Amino acid sequence: HRQEVCHGDCNQHNIIFTREGIGFMNFDYWHCGPQTEDLCLFMRKILEKHNWDPELGRRMAEQYNRKRSLSVEEWKHLKLCLSYPWRYWKLVNYYASSQKVWISRKNIEKIEQATALWQPWQRFLQSFC
């Protein structure tokens, strides 16, 4: 994989639109790595909010690919990153590191939301690439 500068927290909250163009802010998590990590994070955040719509995911990846052509290896890496259950990992990691003996109602709701997205996510992955 190409090692390039990655934003590290590439989501809609860190994008700014100006008259001069589009830019990013908040580089607290920047690092060197494959930029498909940033693309994956951005796509995942948007697609979770759109029930993992395969058509939206395809359009997002195609538009990115128009501006910066992805190699076969980068397409594979993107699919691999999108295949990882980040949301579950984040919830389980938070619970395990909090050292609490109970799960808050809010976290139960987050687990339920993640579970509700499981089937749409699997359908998306089957149709992607």
What are the roles of these predicted feature ranges?
Residues H1-E37:
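Active-site acidic catalytic loop and adjacent metal/ATP-binding pocket
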Residues E73-E74:
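Conserved ATP-binding subdomain of kinase catalytic cores across diverse folds
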Residues F24-M25, R59, C81-Y84, Q113-A116:
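Alpha-helical structural elements
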Residues D9-N11, F27, S69-L70, Q113-L117, ...:
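Short flexible/disordered coil segments
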Residues N11-N14, N26, N51, N65, ...:
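Detector for Asparagine
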Residues T36-S69, L82-K100:
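Active-site activation/catalytic loop segments of kinase-like enzymes and analogous catalytic loops
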Residues W89-C129:
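ATP/Mg2+ or Mg2+-diphosphate-binding catalytic cores
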